[in-house]
């Protein structure tokens, strides 16, 4: 991809031949985060297009499920898609936190937080299908699909975008382009935005299982020396398992005979779910922490994995991206109402200042949890079990931990005053 920028000294020349703006917002990436942003702009008066390389039926076929925080539920409700999603996903009312074979279990309950639930677990296809159906009814939003981005030229007053759609090259013009194209974002890389972080010594192995015993709408997070294991309840007495282990061990687990694998998984879940059955393949992917130096530049904004990636412990990754999408939608809507140019850095810095610091806190917290709760050094084991004991006995610490886990700390996007107050 070729990305070019014209200096501000050429603005008088560019202004004299300024093309007609086709779209106010160009979103590259039609996944959940990009779709969240588009849904959030449904009534903004802005004209939006989404560039997506995959056909919708392919995009929604991804076999993955996510923990969704209370804050994520509020954001999705405010943009109008939650009612279609919530009836098809699981609401959980308890979180059990434990350390390998240690007998103490921290049980987080709704009354610890003063809410009716603690979170949700939703499958990728259900969430994205609801968003796609919603977007199909928005006259101000269009799709370029399947299409790939070829060139981007940044001008003082607009961004020039060239795409390839079924062999044809098309060029159009927008006020801002948004990178929702994942952790290997070409838009970010070609814009010269640097990232910092590291690859962990671990990979995740993810799968869907069917359980003999009811999961009772409880989410489990169990820490082992090799890494954490999350078990998330799904409808139909199914669970999504995310098992973190060193790279070689994760690959060995993927290749292990199914019967032996299930025996090991039954042991790791403490027998609480009874006999287990695999309903999906075992998917292995590496784990990394990444934070972009900048979330914005002139006429460009990064959201979701294009801006940051975190360890899966606590299930915060997608929730961070959805908050990015909601926050950017709010910033762009308010700027539009004020008559501001939504692609200018002074507007986009409001989004960056809001989300970059909040995401850094979550990145630091997930990294701390993984490093603290992994390993079998005597001092580490003693400290983490002391921490679990404190959480068991001191209600205020449970309350604060739950505020973090449920996304209720920090500034929330306010896309619908009737919901957010």
Residue ranges of model-derived segments:
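C-terminal helical "tail/cap" subdomain of flavin- and related membrane-associated enzymes
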Residues: 4-6, 330-421
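FAD/FMN-dependent oxidoreductases across multiple families
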Residues: 251-343
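Glycine-rich FAD pyrophosphate-binding loop
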Residues: 42-64
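N-terminal Rossmann-like FAD-binding beta1-loop-alpha1 element of flavoenzymes
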Residues: 22-50
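Conserved Rossmann-like nucleotide-cofactor binding loop
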Residues: 33, 56, 184
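Conserved FAD-binding catalytic core of PHBH/FMO-like flavoproteins
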Residues: 76, 158, 166-171, 176-282, ...
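N-terminal FAD cofactor-binding segment of flavoenzymes
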Residues: 63-100
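Conserved N-terminal helical subregion
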Residues: 18-22, 88-190, 198-203
């Amino acid at each position: 991809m070729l990305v070019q920028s014209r200096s501000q000294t050429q603005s008088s020349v560019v202004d004299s031949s300024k093309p007609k703006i086709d779209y106010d917002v160009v979103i590259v990436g039609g996944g959940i985060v990009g779709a969240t942003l588009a849904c959030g702009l449904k009534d903004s008066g802005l004209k939006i297009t989404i560039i997506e390389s995959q056909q919708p039926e392919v995009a929604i076929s991804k076999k993955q499920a996510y923990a969704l925080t209370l804050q994520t539920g509020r954001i999705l409700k405010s943009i109008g898609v939650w009612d279609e999603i919530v009836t098809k996903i699981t609401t959980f009312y308890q979180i059990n936190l434990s350390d390998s074979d240690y007998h103490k279990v921290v049980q987080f309950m709704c009354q610890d937080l003063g809410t009716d639930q603690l979170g949700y677990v939703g499958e990728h296809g259900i969430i994205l299908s609801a968003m796609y159906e919603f977007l199909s009814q928005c006259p101000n939003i269009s799709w370029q699909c399947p299409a790939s981005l070829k060139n981007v030229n940044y001008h003082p007053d607009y961004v020039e975008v060239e795409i390839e759609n079924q062999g044809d090259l098309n060029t159009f013009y927008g006020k801002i382009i948004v990178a929702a194209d994942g952790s290997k974002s070409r838009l970010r890389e070609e814009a010269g935005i640097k990232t910092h972080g590291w690859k962990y010594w671990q990979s995740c192995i993810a799968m869907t299982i069917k359980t003999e015993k009811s999961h009772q709408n409880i989410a489990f997070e169990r820490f082992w020396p090799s890494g954490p294991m999350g078990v998330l309840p799904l409808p139909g007495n199914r669970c999504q398992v995310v098992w973190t282990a060193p790279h070689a061990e994760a690959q060995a687990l993927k290749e292990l005979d199914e019967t032996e694998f299930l025996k090991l998984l039954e042991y790791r879940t403490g027998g609480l779910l009874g006999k287990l059955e695999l309903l999906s393949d075992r998917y292995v992917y590496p784990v990394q922490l990444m934070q972009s130096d900048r979330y914005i530049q002139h006429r460009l904004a990064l959201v979701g994995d294009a801006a940051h990636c975190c360890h899966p412990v606590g299930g915060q990754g997608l929730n961070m991206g959805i908050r990015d999408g909601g926050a950017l939608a709010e910033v762009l809507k308010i700027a539009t109402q004020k008559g501001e140019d939504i692609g200018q850095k002074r507007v986009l810095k409001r989004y960056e200042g809001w989300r970059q610091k909040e995401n850094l806190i979550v990145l630091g917290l997930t990294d701390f949890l993984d490093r603290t709760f992994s390993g079998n050094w005597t001092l580490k084991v003693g400290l983490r079990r002391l921490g679990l004991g404190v959480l068991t006995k001191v209600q205020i610490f449970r309350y604060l931990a739950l505020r973090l886990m449920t996304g209720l700390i920090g500034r929330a996007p306010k896309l619908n005053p009737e919901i957010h107050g």
